[in-house]
């Protein structure tokens, strides 16, 4: 079985989404805290990286990233790599997953897809989809 990890950052107590991700048996959750994250943050199954854990891991990197930003998740990516992750998914801590989340992955599979090429300097890939509700990240 593949070694699958879910990475997110948070400043909140565990949300409904976090509880659902934390209870997935075929994924392991890593939550990266920030200075605003409650100090008593706790997961049943997953790994919580406190600000202190991050600073102890690599103070220079912590200082370079800064606080109160999503880039703190890099510590989660490093931890997953250290734990020999085969697949890593990044999520938001407030987006509750559908029941089929993480199932039927296309990783390492051949799939048909549309390919777009342009000579323009900038290309908006969402403009060529049928998904007008998507937003740029």
Q: Which ranges hold each PLM region?
A:
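Short aromatic/hydrophobic "clamp" motif used to bind/position activated sugar donors
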Residues: 88
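Acidic ATP/Mg2+-coordinating residue in the GHKL
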Residues: 32-36
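Catalytic metal- and UDP-sugar-binding loop of GT-A-like glycosyltransferases, i.e.
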Residues: 91
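Active-site-proximal specificity loops/subdomain of glycosyltransferases
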Residues: 37-84, 99-113
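Surface-exposed, flexible loop/turn segments at secondary-structure boundaries
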Residues: 12-14, 37, 96
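N-proximal low-complexity "stem/linker" segments adjacent to membrane-targeting elements
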Residues: 1-30
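Conserved donor-nucleotide/metal-binding helix-loop-beta segment in metal-dependent transferases, i.e.
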Residues: 96-137
